């Protein structure tokens, strides 16, 4: 969890630079890739993270480190983002890498916007999440720290080679396994799904069922929950074969569980309560 200073630094930096990053349009693809690469470099060097976040070090010195590291090899917007980040205060040195990754995903979202693929990528990430729930062995290998990042990416490509995924979906999914960042693979994919949902101005409604939802069911759920929360919602359909009947629906912290298992558990609690002597 990030400290207060890091949360403020991340939010203010992204809020201030979002319009410029959005305006890069197709160039955002290059910027996002560069930021993912920088995230990996930072993760691999705590010394570099400390050099770029040391509060006692002048900002000019930190920018000099950036210039030596990146030179003229990156997009000007990438350099502007990094310069802004090193000028801010961070609770922990490693939090700057988190902020760089945030910007990387933002850049990919803006590229998706520019190419009219935002909704497609959001849906594909949700479908990918559901597919991997049913592939526990593959899922485990995608965040296997004993394997090389190259091996994990190769596995992902082999498993999903038959899918015609948008290149943004592919890049985000590969980033999630290439640079694990102390997270399980599906945690990263879910984080990206949530970011896309917020980006599109929607609320995320996660619906877990034993079999895929039909289009009519998704349409009805969108209508019901859009009316309930007062804004458009996105249905994140999760398929979990272990679910017995019904649906488990989560909106933020609110969970509605009408699966058979949940109903049996509620019945069991009710019986126990009634059987308890007064």
From Swiss-Prot:
According to Swiss-Prot or TrEMBL, what is its membrane topology? Peripheral membrane protein
Q: Which GO terms describe its molecular function?
A: proton-transporting ATP synthase activity, rotational mechanism
Extract one GO cellular component term from the record: proton-transporting ATP synthase complex
Pfam annotation, one family: OSCP
State the superkingdom.
Bacteria
Q: Which residues form the signal peptide?
A: none
Q: Which PROSITE patterns match?
A: ATPASE_DELTA
Q: What's in the keyword line of the UniProt record?
A: ATP synthesis, Cell membrane, CF(1), Hydrogen ion transport, Ion transport, Membrane, Transport
What does the UniProt entry say about where the protein is found? Answer: Cell membrane
Tell me its family: Belongs to the ATPase delta chain family.
Its quaternary organisation is: F-type ATPases have 2 components, F(1) - the catalytic core - and F(0) - the membrane proton channel. F(1) has five subunits: alpha(3), beta(3), gamma(1), delta(1), epsilon(1). F(0) has three main subunits: a(1), b(2) and c(10-14). The alpha and beta chains form an alternating ring which encloses part of the gamma chain. F(1) is attached to F(0) by a central stalk formed by the gamma and epsilon chains, while a peripheral stalk is formed by the delta and b chains.
Function according to Swiss-Prot or TrEMBL? F(1)F(0) ATP synthase produces ATP from ADP in the presence of a proton or sodium gradient. F-type ATPases consist of two structural domains, F(1) containing the extramembraneous catalytic core and F(0) containing the membrane proton channel, linked together by a central stalk and a peripheral stalk. During catalysis, ATP synthesis in the catalytic domain of F(1) is coupled via a rotary mechanism of the central stalk subunits to proton translocation. This protein is part of the stalk that links CF(0) to CF(1). It either transmits conformational changes from CF(0) to CF(1) or is implicated in proton conduction.
What is this protein's record name? ATP synthase subunit delta
Q: Which species is this record about? A: Bifidobacterium longum subsp. infantis (strain ATCC 15697 / DSM 20088 / JCM 1222 / NCTC 11817 / S12)
